């Protein structure tokens, strides 16, 4: 049998940062499209506004630091951060919120720590937490999905509400479902109903639910899952963190559901609600703020999944990924320290 022998050097080509970011952005698009389909044009407006703010802030900081503006903008990291913030916040949130959050992510969280590759926390999630703590009402006011909404916002409606211009529309009319009741997210609805003494089965008879999952949110998560799988296929991310996140959340929610099925959401509900798939494939996998070794990445991802379940069921914020990711970011150096690969020729430890 003849074997083909290639000439040296026997190396593989590493992906440039800009290429990786481009692939991540492209794989985000299916989720963004589905999210716009269910929650209106406001999401796209928020994303575009966030991109403008992020690129402007990046350019200003690079100018002040006397670094190359072109090189910094062309790595696409600021644009990716902007898109993640834009899809994470409610689609009709006031314009100044996305401006504050994006500027905070780029200027404070990213560049105050030294720029790309030096930040301790995920910039998008740090910005989300800042906005959530500072403006809890606006950050938890989502409109009803288009398929069960009494009224869906047009492009003009979205612009008027986001930029607070015109007086012929208000947020409340877009929160009403076809049953005439103001809607919250499935996670919010279930948590509120359980706190009022209703069972899971009773809560899930509401219009915001479709079987075991939430209306709209199942398809949004499915779209981000599809994009995430393509991202894995393109080798832009590794499988360890995403698998750890989903496994940790699945195991924790399965235990809770088996122990108390009347007061806990099912594993399927947790996996396809809120930002689960978005966070598992596009947020938690940030290589700068995550653990570095393969075993460390699995532990890092699993920790996020478990924290999400604990915060969702015991905390005050039903979609807990931002807090879980930031807490795991804090733990990443410790995970790397205690889960170091054994050096060749040396014993473990």
From Swiss-Prot:
Its EC number is 7.-.-.-. Keywords: Cell inner membrane, Cell membrane, Electron transport, Flavoprotein, FMN, Membrane, Phosphoprotein, Translocase, Transmembrane, Transmembrane helix, Transport. It is found in: Cell inner membrane. GO terms for cellular component: plasma membrane. It is a multi-pass membrane protein. InterPro entries: NqrB/RnfD, RnfD_bac. One of its GO terms (biological process) is electron transport chain. The modification FMN phosphoryl threonine is found at residue 185. It comes from the Bacteria. The chain crosses the membrane at residues 37-57, 73-90, 124-144, 212-232, 239-259, 265-285, 291-311, 315-335. Its cofactor is FMN. Belongs to the NqrB/RnfD family. HAMAP family: RsxD_RnfD. Part of a membrane-bound complex that couples electron transfer with translocation of ions across the membrane. The complex is composed of six subunits: RnfA, RnfB, RnfC, RnfD, RnfE and RnfG. This is Ion-translocating oxidoreductase complex subunit D. It comes from Shewanella sp. (strain W3-18-1).
């Amino acid at each position: 049998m003849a074997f083909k022998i290639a000439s040296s050097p026997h190396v593989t080509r590493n992906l440039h940062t800009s290429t990786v970011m481009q692939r991540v952005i492209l794989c985000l698009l299916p989720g963004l499209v589905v999210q716009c389909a269910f929650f209106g044009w406001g999401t796209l407006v928020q994303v575009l506004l966030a991109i403008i703010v992020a690129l402007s802030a990046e350019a200003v900081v690079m100018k002040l630091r006397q670094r190359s503006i072109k090189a910094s903008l062309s790595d696409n990291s600021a644009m990716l951060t902007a898109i993640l913030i834009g899809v994470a916040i409610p689609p009709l949130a006031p314009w100044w919120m996305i401006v504050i959050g994006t500027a905070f992510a780029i200027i404070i969280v990213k560049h105050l720590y030294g720029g790309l590759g030096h930040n301790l926390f995920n910039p998008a999630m740090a910005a989300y937490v800042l906005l959530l703590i500072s403006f809890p009402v606006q950050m938890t006011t989502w409109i009803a999905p288009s398929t069960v909404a009494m009224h869906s916002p047009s492009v003009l409606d979205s612009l008027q509400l986001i930029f607070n211009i015109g007086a012929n529309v208000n947020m409340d009319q877009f929160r009403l479902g076809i049953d005439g009741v103001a809607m919250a997210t499935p996670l919010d609805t279930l948590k509120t109903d359980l706190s009022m003494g209703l069972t899971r089965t009773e809560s899930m008879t509401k219009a915001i639910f479709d079987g075991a999952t939430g209306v709209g949110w199942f398809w949004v998560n499915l779209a981000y899952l599809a994009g995430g799988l393509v991202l894995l296929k393109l080798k832009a991310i590794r499988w360890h963190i995403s698998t750890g996140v989903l496994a940790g959340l699945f195991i924790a929610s399965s235990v809770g559901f088996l122990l108390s099925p009347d007061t806990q959401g099912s594993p399927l509900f947790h996996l396809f609600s809120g930002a689960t798939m978005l966070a598992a494939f596009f947020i938690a996998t940030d290589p700068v703020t995550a653990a570095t070794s393969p075993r460390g990445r699995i532990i890092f991802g699993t920790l996020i999944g478990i924290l999400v379940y604990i915060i969702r069921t015991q905390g005050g914020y039903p979609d807990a990924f931002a807090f879980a990711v930031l807490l795991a970011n804090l733990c990443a150096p410790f995970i790397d320290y205690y889960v170091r690969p054994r050096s060749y020729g040396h014993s473990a430890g």
